[in-house]
């Protein structure tokens, strides 16, 4: 039984990792931003998310979109991780339509905007090559719009939301 449960959790981690990254790629593309930087770091992003999901240390995936001239946040997308995994029925889904609707609602971003992927992890998490500590840009004057669950596999889930100006 533990072999089956281990395989299933590994499958959940892979599914959730892949679909979080696909969702972020959609956000970047549909917001009118250049996906080249994101594509160039795909392997590193996959390795970090998969590692920290697997150890239970990943708390949040954050895509900061900022004005490079002022270094101020334009918008921010958060995917909060929910660890409610069970080896039950193996249900899985990704709500791409909900995400596309929210991206459309948030609107196109200035073409000069840049983005940065950040991962919020628990203290004591294992190191992943290419990743280090960082700090977030301020969300002062912004309000978060929650979308709810956008990806789930057997209870391991990502709940998306975005920050907009008040």
UniProtKB/Swiss-Prot annotation:
Q: Which cysteines are joined by disulfide bonds?
A: none
**Impact upon substituting residue 95 to K:** No longer binds to CdnD
A Gene Ontology biological process noted in the UniProt record is: defense response to virus
> What Pfam families does this protein map onto?
bacHORMA_2
How does this protein assemble?
Interacts individually with CdnD and Cap8 (also called HORMA3); forms CdnD:Cap7:Cap8 (also called CdnD:HORMA2:HORMA3) complexes with stoichiometries of 1:1:1 and 2:1:1.
Q: What does its UniProt record remark on the domains?
A: Can adopt both open and closed states. Full-length closed state protein binds a closure peptide (consensus Glu-Val-Met-Glu-Phe-Asn-Pro). In the Cap7:Cap8 complex only Cap7 binds a closure peptide.
- Protein name, as recorded: CD-NTase-associated protein 7
